[in-house]
Curated annotation (Swiss-Prot):
The gene is bamD. One of its GO terms (biological process) is protein insertion into membrane. PANTHER family: OUTER MEMBRANE PROTEIN ASSEMBLY FACTOR BAMD, SOLUBLE LYTIC MUREIN TRANSGLYCOSYLASE-RELATED. A lipid is attached at residue 25 (S-diacylglycerol cysteine). SUPFAM superfamilies: TPR-like. The keyword Transferase does not apply. Belongs to the BamD family. It comes from Caulobacter vibrioides (strain ATCC 19089 / CIP 103742 / CB 15) (Caulobacter crescentus). Keywords: Cell outer membrane, Lipoprotein, Membrane, Palmitate, Repeat, Signal, TPR repeat. Residues 1-24 form the signal peptide. A lipid is attached at residue 25 (N-palmitoyl cysteine). TPR repeats lie at residues 41-74, 78-111, 113-136, 174-207. This is Outer membrane protein assembly factor BamD. It is found in: Cell outer membrane.
């Protein structure tokens, strides 16, 4: 029988910009690449952080790269790689941000901030997920990268956010299976449709698509005359989602075919099913260190650099 697992708190994580406040910064850069002028590392870094704070992503990248160029062996240079990646991410330059993260990982694999680099890569893939009617290659990449974060750093805030996003990615993949399954069912390829709906139940059972997948199995099995299978899936739907609209439809469909459903649907306003309660939690809830700011897209910033 279908089991409903405990949902995780939905969190949207704030960014942490590791930077000193700016004192006497240079004026706004006019060109995408800075003209070489030797400057103190603290000034370059803090100016880059200031540009980032103002939303001038490309200028921020220029200053952080200048830190690396002028002071390649300093602690600031290491920090600047991740800040460059963060600025690229904020500017929607995901391929560049992934490249920055990979560079940091290759240079400093044992550094505590490597966890942020892995997280940044995962979030960049996550941001590139497309709708369910298109190829899901980016979705699969995001899922693999997010799982990597959880596996490597299970007790971190990065893993907490990654787990939430894994749930969202699974919902996306389930949606793709459902779209294909509906198409098969509509075009008379019932067995192929059943395979898609069963995949949702077996691989993505905690997603929002599970009730419909069970209903579609009832519908498909009735189409090919497998009444007992239809009744069994209807019972699973009823026991797990008695108040869901898909069970109301399944209940009616089974009755219309002379099959007595095992569970009565809940009345309107009755207690919601477990999955519905999980999915209704506020996904905009914020978890951040004291005094930190919220940032675009809920990215967790580079802690511990």
């Amino acid at each position: 029988m279908l089991r409903i697992f405990q949902g995780r708190p939905a969190v949207t994580i704030a960014a942490v910009l590791v930077a000193a406040s700016v004192a006497g910064c240079a004026g706004k850069a006019k060109k995408p690449t800075l003209v070489y002028e030797e400057r103190p590392v603290e000034l370059l870094y803090s100016t880059g952080a200031d540009r980032l704070d103002r939303g001038n992503w490309n200028e921020a990248v220029d200053y952080f790269r200048e830190v690396e160029r002028q002071h390649p062996y300093s602690e600031w240079s290491r920090r600047s790689i991740l800040m460059t990646g963060y600025a690229h991410y904020m500017g929607n330059q995901y391929a560049e941000a992934i490249g920055d993260a990979d560079r940091f990982i290759s240079l400093y694999p044992g550094n505590p901030s490597a966890q942020y680099a892995f997280y940044l890569k995962a979030i960049c893939y996550f941001e590139q997920i497309v709708d369910v009617n298109r190829d899901q290659a980016a979705t699969e990449q995001a899922l693999a990268a997010l799982r990597d974060v959880v596996q490597r750093y299970p007790n971190t805030e990065y893993a907490t956010d990654a787990r939430l996003k894994i749930d969202m990615v699974n919902d996306q993949l389930a949606g793709k299976e459902m779209a294909i399954g509906r198409w098969y069912l509509k075009n008379g390829q019932t067995l192929a449709a059943i395979g898609r709906f069963k995949a949702v139940i077996e691989r993505h059972q905690t997603t929002s698509h599970t009730p419909e997948a069970l209903f579609r199995l009832v519908e498909a099995y009735l189409t090919i005359g497998l009444n007992e299978e239809a009744k069994r899936n209807g019972a699973v739907l009823g026991y797990n989602f008695p108040g869901d609209r898909w069970y109301v439809d399944a209940y009616r469909l089974l009755n219309d075919n002379g099959l007595r459903p095992a569970v009565e649907p809940l009345k309107a306003g009755a207690k919601r099913n477990a999955l519905e309660r999980i999915l209704s939690k506020d996904k905009e809830a914020t978890l951040a260190p004291p005094g930190e700011r919220k940032a675009k897209k809920g990215l967790l910033g580079p802690l511990g650099m």
